Regions:
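Generic domain-boundary/flexible-linker signal
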Residues: 124, 187, 197-198
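Active-site-adjacent loop/helix micro-motif of nuclease/hydrolase catalytic cores
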Residues: 193-202
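Active-site ExK catalytic segment of metal-dependent nucleases
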Residues: 184-194
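General structural signal for secondary-structure boundaries
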Residues: 129-132, 195-196, 207
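Mixed-charge (Asp/Glu-Lys/Arg
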Residues: 186, 201-207
């Protein structure tokens, strides 16, 4: 059993669990400093540190321009791949079209970045958000981010690669797509009560 889970079961509070998670984050950052080379160390750390804020946006697409002024994707592509290869994050790519096949049908310059361990997202929240979680069990703007991160983590552990779809000329967006046999299955994550409008639109368009 993971130490974080054992700590919560034994004490029934988040306090000890959060301390363990924060130590894991510190260990991850130390690994980046130890194993990443040259300028990539700073860039990788910047990407890692910006994940919570980027997931808190309505549009959860990761924007390199928000990581550093004047930052360009081509300078950060290897940094994102490094984090993915290290097992620290899961990258979800935007499909060009919501249809099969998935390989070759996505834009590698449009993506979301989730933590491979959803608990680390909680541990990296700002102090105000941490206090709201402890006191009121309220995640505020991070609620949708956490729900998506949990689902993305589960899909990866089930053996799926992560893809989403966002139509450029409308608000239509589907959180995840998975392939089973010859079918493309949309997955919509809802952090609150409401209708799955995007999913219904996609399904109706195939009729």
């Amino acid at each position: 059993m993971p130490a974080v889970v054992r700590e919560f079961i034994d004490k029934g509070t988040f306090e000890g669990s959060l301390e363990i998670q924060r130590q894991l984050i510190a260990d991850y950052k130390e690994d980046i400093r130890k194993y990443a080379e040259g300028m990539d160390q700073t860039r990788i750390l910047n990407v890692f540190n910006h994940i919570p804020a980027q997931l808190a946006k309505d549009n959860k697409k990761f924007q390199i321009s928000k990581v550093s002024s004047g930052a360009r994707f081509r300078d950060y592509r290897g940094c994102i791949e490094w984090l993915d290869d290290a097992g620290m994050v899961n990258v979800c790519y935007c499909l060009n079209f919501p249809e099969l096949p998935l390989q070759g049908n996505y834009d590698d310059t449009k993506y979301k970045i989730y933590f491979a361990d959803s608990g680390l997202l909680v541990a990296m929240l700002d102090e105000e958000a941490q206090e709201d979680l402890r006191t009121n069990k309220n995640l505020g703007v991070y609620k949708g981010a956490l729900y998506e991160n949990v689902v993305g983590e589960a899909l990866v552990k089930a053996g799926y690669k992560l893809y989403y779809y966002k139509r450029d000329d409308s608000s239509l967006e589907q959180d995840f797509f998975v392939r089973t046999a010859n079918a493309l299955i949309p997955v919509e994550v809802k952090a609150k009560n409401g209708t799955a409008k995007s999913m219904r639109t996609l399904i109706n368009s195939e009729k």
